[in-house]
Curated annotation (Swiss-Prot):
Subunit structure: Interacts with CD-NTase DncV in the presence and absence of phage T2. A Cap2 dimer is bound on either side by a DncV monomer.
Protein name: ATP-dependent ubiquitin transferase-like protein Cap2
CDD domains: E1_enzyme_family
Provenance organism: Vibrio cholerae serotype O1 (strain ATCC 39315 / El Tor Inaba N16961)
Keyword line: Antiviral defense, Isopeptide bond, Transferase
E.C. number: 2.3.2.-
Positions bearing the site annotation: Adenylated: R390
Region (Linker domain): 138-338
Domain notes: Has an N-terminal E2-like domain, a linker and a C-terminal adenylation plus E1-like domain, dimerizes via the E1-like domain.
Region (E2-like domain): 1-137
Effect of inactivating the gene: Essential for CBASS function; when the operon missing this gene is introduced in E.coli it no longer protects against phages T2, T4, T5 or T6.
Residues of the active site: C90 (for e2-like domain), C522 (for e1-like domain)
Amino acid sequence: MKQELHHTLLGCGFRYTPAKQMPKGILLDTKSRRKGYYVKEYSTKGGVFVIALVLWNDPHIQLPFAYILQQPEQYKGRLLPHINFGFCLCYVTQMEADWNSNDLKSTYQDVDEQIQLTLDNSVASVESGTSNDVELEGEFSAYWQSEEELYLLAKPSRKAQLKAHLVEAELSSGSIRREYVAACSEQSEELVKWLNQRKFDESSLQEVSITTHCISVKPNRLAGVNWPPSCLREVLSWLKLVDYSAHARTVTLLMAKRTKRHILLFDVEGQDELAVYLELNLDVIGKRYFGRNAARKRNINNEAALLGGKFVSANFKRLGVTRADRDTLLSRNQSRPDVGNLSQKRIALIGCGTIGGYLAELLLRSGAGCGENYFHLYDNDSFKPHNFARHSLTAHNFGLAKSIALANSLKEAVHIAQSIKGIDRQFPIQADVLSKYDIVIDATGRPPVSKRLAAVARTLIADIRPVLIHAFNDGNGRASKVLVDDGRCCYGCMMADPAVYRNNIDLRFEGIDLAKEKHISCGSTYTPYDAAVSHITAALAQEAVLNTLEHTLPWNYSEHMLDGSRSKKPRTLKRFSGCNICDE
């Protein structure tokens, strides 16, 4: 294998260079006697790049790392697409890429061609200098080389009054973990939860907050600029080059008042945010530059020159920005973000057993209870050791009410979970209670509850009637089933169809003695089966709940069979004539 790869790379124009013969001062191992690298010169319109390939232990499934040993002088210190830290060439998205891992020759010939193509595209991007550079699309911030992290708990905008705090925590190893956190003033509760969940000390909030400025940047170019900036002067120079309006706003904000500590949050159009933390030396700037009369004409260039002075910025750090606002946290769980998320719905979950426990966690990650509207969990049972094998709760919750323990678990999961409540009693199936919710989920698996919910819901007018979702395991764990009752078909309609059910039993299970499989004792009934069925039922129920955000429901019944038989396709059931609930 090594000989085949060696000859393939030599055939592509690489030369094998022992580690000890590599240039000094590079970030590769140049001392090992056994190591070596494959080096090649690539010609582009901008000059010659010298690339060294670093091979991994298994070259079949890991593509080589491309290290830039040398690049044209005019590009040094400038932002080139796909080149990070000045030496790392990102020629492929390896984790998403696919290649024939059993054909080394073709794979490494493709690597050679891809390196050439990447370098050509990078040089062309610098020379064109456009603002909508496809080579930098969505990855401009990757070249920022941040020194510390800033987490945003709110969407950045010019109107948002963000305040930031530096928080610290001592790890068990004795080292200190620190980060900057920015939030709006009305997010004080979320901010405290963020600190607690991430094991930071709340006392950090007693310190004076850091003034945070959000500045929109619409650059006229991205590639080719000197990058990354290492001081405030270089930041201002960059802004002046690419967006003079953002440059003027930055200078104006910094000179507006006597504030030592600032965070500049740059919202670069079409890219992720960048941030800078800096401390201004107010004595150097001088009192005469603060609180200027608005009627007096400013000289932005003079003020920028002052701010860029050698002794003005006492501390400067590039911050990596990570958004942790509600929309960002929920974004990957939305196939269609335009329909919104469950934070806008009032939801009741009846039953916090196996299905309800898994479903509650899924709904949280779709936004339930993460806004002004509430997410209520109902169950009057407690969590016991024999529930553990099929439940999401842990041994910490033994003896506690399922609903309250589950609600606490959800609230501890993320800082935006602010409207979740566990209620340690049965759900009161009354019209006035049902009308308080948009969605009521029946995860009890009890037919009497399902029938009563369907009947009482029909005493409400359509405008205030909630959507009922029945999620249950059937056939003693052989099937996962979900029915959505939006007024067109109820639980009784489903059970009354003689083509599917007889005596409330699915015809597919008539030949099975279901009662014999159950373990029944006074006050306790259970059926042993794999928890996978409840996972599937919860997943189907989550899909059903998310479908209520759409203008029309794609289906109102879905199932999955786990006994090897064929599952019916999701479908729309209609009202059944003779249903003793709908026809009364």
